[in-house]
């Protein structure tokens, strides 16, 4: 069995203050904006934190988004209920994309060949018309 020493592990935390502010808003205000009439308000909140979201797209209030500033959503796309977007790298959804309920999109992992298990990231790009089935996992580097 391999022994792992993580005492020297360090992960850079760019935009730490912004990240903390967003996490508070995502866990509170964003989740309170329930219903179709408030979807534009949710999108405005995401845009205020740097997301690029085309009009006509829906992001459900129960979604958990790590970094809106690394998120781009095309026209008429939908990020369904309880979806998690762990985007330490860019996530781009094309036009008419559906990410169904409970799905997890993850742009990060750790390099297990490195004794320090350093963080590795790669973007996710879902082209126009992609449908991600419920409770799916989409890993880093998927295109």
Regions found by a protein language model. Give the residues of each.
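Left-handed beta-helix
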Residues: 55, 60-61, 66-67, 74-75, ...
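A short acidic, helix-capping loop that chelates divalent metal ions and anchors anionic groups
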Residues: 113-115
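Histidine-centered active-site/metal-ligand motif
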Residues: 110
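Residues at secondary-structure transition points
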Residues: 36, 48, 68, 88, ...
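Terminal amphipathic alpha-helical/low-complexity segments used for targeting or macromolecular assembly
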Residues: 1-51, 55, 129, 142
């Amino acid at each position: 069995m391999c022994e792992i020493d993580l005492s020297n592990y360090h992960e850079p935390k760019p935009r730490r203050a912004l990240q903390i502010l967003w996490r508070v808003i995502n866990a509170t205000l964003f989740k309170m904006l329930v219903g179709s009439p408030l979807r534009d308000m949710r999108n405005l909140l995401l845009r205020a934190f740097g997301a690029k979201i085309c009009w006509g797209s829906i992001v459900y209030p129960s979604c958990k988004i790590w970094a809106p500033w690394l998120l781009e959503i095309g026209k008429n796309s939908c990020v369904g209920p309880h979806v998690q977007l762990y985007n330490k790298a860019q996530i781009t959804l094309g036009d008419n994309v559906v990410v169904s309920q409970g799905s997890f999109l993850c742009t990060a992992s750790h390099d297990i060949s490195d004794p320090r298990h350093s963080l590795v990231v790669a973007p996710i790009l879902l082209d126009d018309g992609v449908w991600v089935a419920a409770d799916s996992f989409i890993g880093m580097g998927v295109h």
